[in-house]
Regions:
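N-terminal secretory signal peptides
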Residues: 1-23
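Hydrophobic structural segments
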Residues: 22-314
Length: 314
């Protein structure tokens, strides 16, 4: 069983977090030094040794496409020669994810999304930021390596995120042949369809536009971020498409478009899952994929906690 995410804190918890930052930082450094010593002692007694560069080389060999010259993928934190004791895959390498990975002795983290708050993982503006520094210090203390796998995981055939989300939702037998994210189902109401999705994904903050009684038969899914144009305008305009499912989008693009469709009399619906929720299954599948060519160490999926909650849940 993978390490469970902690629930997203209520807003007041951040004040306590800020007050205790320095104390927690010292505690993490002490604990990290002890854990690193344990890892080194274990490695001396184990015949299966693998370093970061070997893992990276195997990933590059297995993705099935040439490695891009311009890409966000690659080693974000750590060096190629560090010994790997265990691997965690995750949608987003939050500090909470890193803490749970370290506790499970997984010191190489394969993340789909950025670690340092921008798509390019640019850290220049963060040089003196206390949250950034705390995260870096935790990783250094626990000898954690971060490798990003975004562009090439999407670039695989089939797309690694798409494959994992189909498995996670139980939609594998519903995809329209030779389509990109199009599915057909036996007719059910939007209320029932969205509830089934929420249950499968453990989603607690998905947002829905449309009549709860709307019959759902044909669905277009686009995981992660999706723009109306040029990504989804043709699909959303199709009269035979009942529902669009995305991870996130701008409210003045796809959201407004679907609202206007409904106001004009069209039978349409939109589900916004949240970015992490909409790609989490893809990184769960990534762990399964990597186990086939990384036998030396454990490979586990460590889910990122859904960051949002609804007031009624508190």
């Amino acid at each position: 069983m993978y390490p469970e995410p902690r629930p997203a804190p209520c807003p007041g918890a951040y004040y306590e977090y800020n007050n205790r930052m320095n104390i927690n930082r010292r505690s993490l450094l002490i604990a990290g030094a002890a854990l690193a010593s344990t890892w080194r002692a274990h490695s001396q007694n184990s015949g299966d040794v693998i370093i970061v560069q070997q893992v990276v080389d195997r990933i590059k060999a297995k993705v099935g496409i040439p490695w891009l010259a311009e890409t966000v993928d690659g080693l974000i934190v750590g060096s190629p020669g560090i010994q790997v004791h265990g691997i965690a895959t995750t949608a987003m390498a939050t500090l909470d994810v890193l803490q749970r990975a370290a506790a499970a002795s997984l010191n190489m983290v394969i993340t789909h999304e950025p670690t340092f708050y921008s798509h390019q993982d640019a850290t220049g503006p963060l040089a003196t930021d206390p949250t950034y520094l705390a995260k870096r210090e935790f990783m250094a203390a626990h000898e954690i390596v971060i490798f990003r796998l975004h562009d090439h995981w999407h670039g695989m055939t089939p797309d690694g995120i798409d494959t994992g989300m189909r498995y996670e939702l139980g939609w594998d037998g519903h995809q329209v042949a030779n389509s990109d994210g199009e599915f057909t189902f036996a007719t059910s109401q939007l209320r029932e369809f969205s509830a089934a999705m929420a249950a499968r994904l453990g989603a607690r903050s998905m947002r829905i536009i449309g009549d709860p009684k709307l019959p759902i038969r044909r669905v277009i899914a686009s995981w992660g971020y999706s723009s109306l144009m040029p990504d989804l305008i043709k699909a959303a305009a199709r009269p035979d498409v009942d529902l669009i499912v995305v991870g996130e989008t701008r409210e003045w693009e796809l959201v407004e478009y679907v609202q206007d469709q409904i106001a004009a009399g069209a039978n349409k619906a939109l589900i916004i899952l949240g970015h992490v929720t909409s790609e989490q299954g893809g990184m769960k599948y990534c762990a399964k994929w990597m186990k086939d060519f990384i036998p030396e160490v454990p490979v586990e999926f460590v889910p990122a906690a859904e960051p949002f909650y609804q007031l009624k849940q508190r």
